[in-house]
């Protein structure tokens, strides 16, 4: 507990909240261009080949973004929309690619949770 004299000398600093997605620069989404599309393996208890893309954003940042859903059409130079949201078992992956916008097509034959994967309503 500081004394009154200490508080006069140096005031209390407000707690600054640190953003979890700095590359978006406070925007809900950002557009970017894929520089590399590849797979990586998750952390210890899990095992898979997770699809990710290295994306150069319009804000100038180069980030790693997760490609959700089964199957994708992304390749180098694809233009994608990126949103925040980390993948818990992939260290360093703090962004998701939005499916069904720009060059990223929606997931084929998706019945449930379609809005999250850019899938149209089946006829």
From Swiss-Prot:
Any one annotated GO CC term: small ribosomal subunit
Pfam families from the UniProt entry: Ribosom_S12_S23 (PF00164)
Keyword list, A-Z: Chloroplast, Plastid, Ribonucleoprotein, Ribosomal protein, RNA-binding, rRNA-binding
Bilayer-spanning residue ranges: none
Localization: Plastid, Chloroplast
InterPro entries reported for this sequence: NA-bd_OB-fold, Ribosomal_uS12, Ribosomal_uS12_bac
Subunit structure: Part of the 30S ribosomal subunit.
Entry function: With S4 and S5 plays an important role in translational accuracy. Located at the interface of the 30S and 50S subunits.
Official protein name in the record: Small ribosomal subunit protein uS12cz/uS12cy
Protein's organism: Lotus japonicus
Name of the gene: rps12-A
């Amino acid at each position: 507990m500081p004394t009154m004299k200490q508080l006069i000398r140096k005031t209390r600093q407000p707690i600054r909240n640190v953003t979890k997605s700095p590359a978006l620069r406070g925007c809900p989404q950002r557009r970017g261009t894929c520089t590399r599309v590849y797979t990586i393996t998750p952390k210890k208890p899990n095992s898979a080949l997770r699809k990710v893309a290295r994306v150069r954003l319009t804000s100038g940042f180069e980030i790693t973004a997760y490609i959700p859903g089964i199957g994708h059409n992304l390749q180098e130079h694809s233009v994608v929309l990126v949103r925040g949201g980390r993948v818990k078992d992939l260290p360093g992956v703090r962004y998701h690619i939005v499916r069904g916008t720009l060059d990223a097509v929606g997931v084929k034959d998706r019945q449930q949770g379609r809005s999250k994967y850019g899938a149209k309503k089946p006829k």
